[in-house]
Amino acid sequence: MTKTADLKGSNFTLSVLHLPNDDVALALSMLEQKVAQAPSFFASAPVVVNIENVSNEINFVELKSGVERTGMIPVGITGCKDKQKQAQATAAGFAVMTSFTPQQVTQKANMQPTKVVKTPIRSGQQIYAKDADLVILNHVSPGAEVIADGSIHIHGTLRGRAIAGASGQAEAKVFCKNLQAELISIAGNYWLSDQIDKEYWHQNVMITMVEDRIQIDTLTL
């Protein structure tokens, strides 16, 4: 029997660039700085632009080309009810996306056994625990990336990037013995190294999501 193409709805985690005003150049400058801090994380990553707080006209062509120059892929705009702006955004190549409150993923459906890695994770390496928790019994070097659909436990120093809840599980956590991360992320919410308070640097910590915000707590164990 011949199979045919099928079109289904799905949920994806997307980065959102929030514009505080119509100064596109300033927003793009900020985006370039963020991408420069973790280029492999943001490379070819889709991004949505939220223009809810912009009351003036926007140069959507400049906005789209500027985002593309950073290496990210602009897929659409959100926060816009103005039909004229929607038409301008569409003409520039943006999709117009409806804002919504995503349902939190609470079920750990089809979770697999925990993936355990005993060796150091070296620069340029990527480890992914699909539908599972991830345990690293060693260090994660700068430029390395560890990803899990569940939680991540690092029994060493985290100098690279840790991405937990990659499939959208907001209850996922990151544990590490020594926090020096380039980037930490849970369910699509991320902090770069400059957003991590220095009081948590070099500390044994637990990283969670609380009320849609990343929270870091030191552990005494």
Curated annotation (Swiss-Prot):
Official protein name in the record: Probable septum site-determining protein MinC
Function description: Cell division inhibitor that blocks the formation of polar Z ring septums. Rapidly oscillates between the poles of the cell to destabilize FtsZ filaments that have formed before they mature into polar Z rings. Prevents FtsZ polymerization.
Family under the similarity heading: Belongs to the MinC family.
UniProt cross-references to Pfam families, sorted A to Z: MinC_C, MinC_N
Keywords tagged on the record: Cell cycle, Cell division, Septation
UniProt organism field: Aliivibrio fischeri (strain ATCC 700601 / ES114)
Any one GO biological process: division septum assembly
Assembly with partners or alone: Interacts with MinD and FtsZ.
SUPFAM superfamilies in the record: Cell-division inhibitor MinC, C-terminal domain
Entry-linked Gene3D superfamilies: 2.160.20.70, 3.30.70.260
InterPro entries found in the cross-reference section: CAP/MinC_C, MinC, MinC_C_sf, MinC_N, Septum_form_inhib_MinC_C
